[in-house]
Regions:
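Acidic/histidine-rich alpha-helical segments that form the ligand environment
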Residues: 85-135, 153
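Short, contiguous alpha-helical
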Residues: 11-25, 33-94, 137-177
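Short Lys/Arg-rich basic patches
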Residues: 6-10
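A generic structural signal for well-ordered alpha-helical segments enriched in polar/charged residues
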Residues: 19, 23, 27, 61, ...
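Short, Lys/Arg-enriched N-terminal segments with co-localized hydrophobic residues
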Residues: 1-4
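A short secondary-structure junction motif
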Residues: 28-31, 129-132, 169
Length: 177
């Protein structure tokens, strides 16, 4: 059926963005990952760390809300591992360049672990869906109201956008790929 094909397509598109993040992080040092590559010329070109963290955060918060579960940020110890100097409810999509620069890691393993957990959460959620629930309204604060399918497409599109930005950021750092 067409609706099941839509779920399979969402899973495929989501997995492609994770593969791009893996390529963007391949061989990168912690210092390179934490660097905003063009802070004076283009301060909104964020670091690899911020792009990965933000994407994981969006997948985590949006899918957890849809699933009615706590975030993996809270339940898998990521909050403690990152120990960011930002409020736990920081609206990362509204970060200034100065706030984005505060998202740094001392261990790339922590960053990759959060990405992996967020992608695993989203993928498991998608696999568990039935086509009948895609048209369920999940947010009435928008006009028109947002369906489950639209919310999922939005967060997966965000992941695709930021994974592409991560590859570009890698190149701005002078790294191949």
């Amino acid at each position: 059926p067409l609706a099941m094909a839509a779920i399979d397509m969402l899973i495929d598109v989501l997995s492609r963005s994770r593969e791009r993040f893996a390529r963007a992080l391949d061989g990168v040092t912690v210092e390179q990952a934490n660097t905003q590559p063009t802070p004076e010329l283009a301060p909104r070109v964020d670091s690899l760390t911020w792009l990965c963290w933000h994407t994981a955060r969006e997948l985590d918060t949006q899918v957890s809300a849809l699933a009615g579960t706590e975030t993996v940020w809270a339940t898998r110890g990521h909050r403690e591992r990152f120990a960011l100097p930002l409020p736990d409810d920081t609206e990362d999509w509204r970060h200034t360049p100065e706030e984005a620069a505060q998202v740094v890691v001392s261990d790339l393993g922590a960053l990759v672990a959060y990405l992996d957990d967020a992608y695993a959460l989203a993928t498991a959620y998608l696999h568990a869906l039935t086509p009948q629930v895609l048209d369920d309204v999940v947010d009435t604060s928008w006009a028109p109201p947002v369906t489950r399918a639209v919310r999922l497409a939005s967060v997966i599109d965000d992941a695709a956008q930021h994974s592409g930005q991560a590859v570009y950021t890698r190149r701005l750092l002078g790294l191949p790929g």
